[in-house]
Amino acid sequence: MTPVWISALGLCVTILVGAILGFFIKELPHKWNDTVLGYCAGIMLAASILGLIVPAFNATAAWWLVVLGVMAGAAFLNVLDLITPHLHHITGLEQEEHLNNKTLNHVLLFVMAIALHKLPEGMAAGVSMSNSCGSPTDWSVSVGIALQNVPEAMVIIAPLLLAGVSKLRTVCISFAIGLLEITGVWIGYGLGSASDTMLPVMLGFAGGAMLYVTSDEMIPETHAHGYQKQATYALLLGFMTLLVMEKAVC
C-alpha cells in the first residue's frame, strides 16, 4: 500500500474511531479535551512549518509564490468560515421533525464547519505526501490531522444524538466526513504531483490553511475553558515532539 493510501485511510479511520468513542464517552472533560487539542495544535504548527512551508521555500527560488500560496490557503479557510452558516440548509435535516429543531440547526452548523475543514486538511496531507522523501515531517501533517480528528469526531456525536438524529444517520454523517477528507488527500496529492512549478504553491497553500486552522480555531478553543496553561504546555510538548522526531532520524 502506497504512503498516500495509508495517509488517506488512516485519516478516515481516526474519524470513525472518534465517532465510535463519542457513543460511549458522552462528554469529554474540558481539561482533557483542551490538553489533547493543545498537543495536536503543537504538532500541527510544527508540521505546517517543517513539513509544508519550509519545503515549499526549498523547492523554488520564487519565494513570493510560496508567500502567495500561504496567504491564499489562509484566505480560503476564511471564506469557508464566512459561508458555513448558509450551508446547513443543503442537508435537509433541518426540515425533519426532531426533538429540538432549534438545537439541531446549531449542531448542524457545527458539524458542517468541521466537515468543510476536512477537505483542505485532507489536501494538506495529500500535498505533503506528494513531496515525501522519507523524513518524519512527511508524515507529520497526516499524524497531526489524525490526532485532531479523534476529539473532533467525538464532540459531534453527543449533540447530534441529543438533537434527535438517529444513531445510523449519525454514523453516516461521520463516514461522509471521513470520505470528504479522503477526497481532499487525493486532490492535494494530484495537485502537488502535477508539476514542479505547482508543488511549492500547493505546499504553501496547505501550510497557510493549517496555520489558519491552528491559530483561528484550535488555540482559541483550548483557551476558552480556563485550562489555557495546560493547553499551552501541551502545545509546546507537541511542537517539540515533532522537532525531536526530526532530529532523531536526521
Question: What does each model-identified segment do?
Answer:
Residues 1-250:
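Intrinsically disordered, metal-sensing/regulatory segments
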